[in-house]
Amino acid sequence: MFERDEHHFPVKRLLLLGALVGAGAYYLSREQNRKALDAKLAELGLKDAAQDVGSSVTKGWEKTKDAAQNAGSVIADKAQDVAGEVKSAVAGATAEIKDAGKEVADTAKDAGQNVGQNVKREAADLADQAKDKAQDVKADVSKAADQAKDKAQDVAQNVQAGAQQAAANVKDKVQDVKADASKAADQAKDKAQDVAQNVKQGAQQAASDAKDKVQDVKADASRAADQAKDKAQDVAQNVKQSAQDAKTDVDAKAKSWAFDLRTDAEAGKQGGQTGSTTNNAGTAGNTGMTGNTNTRKN
């Protein structure tokens, strides 16, 4: 009866399901597959996400393997316990029946009917105990199988959730990479526009500075020309003033010389009139001329 019930319980299917899930996780966690996946994702800049996927798959495989091992161990232990308990129950029942038979043989002479009833009652009790024990064992086996089934389902759900989470992480990583690339492109565009604007402003500022410099040079040249003109006028004025001063000095000296000559002439004339002889007068005249000459020289 126990073997038939055990065949009807889908333990093998659960083990097969666990083996399939474990095989799938193991296939995804193989070194060469991980390397190929890492190489491909490294080209896309998603190596960290791939490592997360590999880690999730590896953890799922470990959980699946542990659950399968635990389920197998529980079922094997429970089967051994059931076999031991059934064997003990049968051996106990046999021993008790044998003992009861001996007691019946010993007491048959005194109370045959009572012994028969006692033996029948004992046999019924033993049968009921064996039946109850078998039902308890069956319930324990069913409970252990249900626990193993629930454990396998939990592991499968965890593996599926881990795979979905890893896929979502990869998708989010791709979106982040695309967003970063778009942001970098926008920043580069803005930077180029800023550089162009700075260059344009620099050129305009340089042109304005050059224009201002030309205006400054023109102003300096005009100011220098005005200063040169003023300097020339000052020099001309000084020359004119010097010429006028020289002319004034010459006129003054000429007037002084004329006055001296006139004075000397008058003095000579007076000297000639007072002389006693013509020679003396001539001498005086000569002397006067000499004096006038000396005066002019002076």
Swiss-Prot record:
Q: Which UniProt keywords are given for this protein, alphabetically ordered?
A: Repeat
Q: Identify a single GO molecular function assigned to this protein.
A: protein folding chaperone
Could you tell me where the Basic and acidic residues compositional bias lies?
174-193, 209-233
Q: Give residue ranges of the LEA-like repeats.
A: 48-117, 128-197, 201-270
Bias (Low complexity)? 194-208, 275-298
Respond yes or no to whether keyword Repeat is given for this record: yes
**Keyword DNA-binding on this protein?**
no
Where is the stretch described as Disordered?
174-298
**Which family, according to the similarity comment?**
Belongs to the LEA type 1 family.
Entry protein name:
Protein DR_1172
Biological source species: Deinococcus radiodurans (strain ATCC 13939 / DSM 20539 / JCM 16871 / CCUG 27074 / LMG 4051 / NBRC 15346 / NCIMB 9279 / VKM B-1422 / R1)
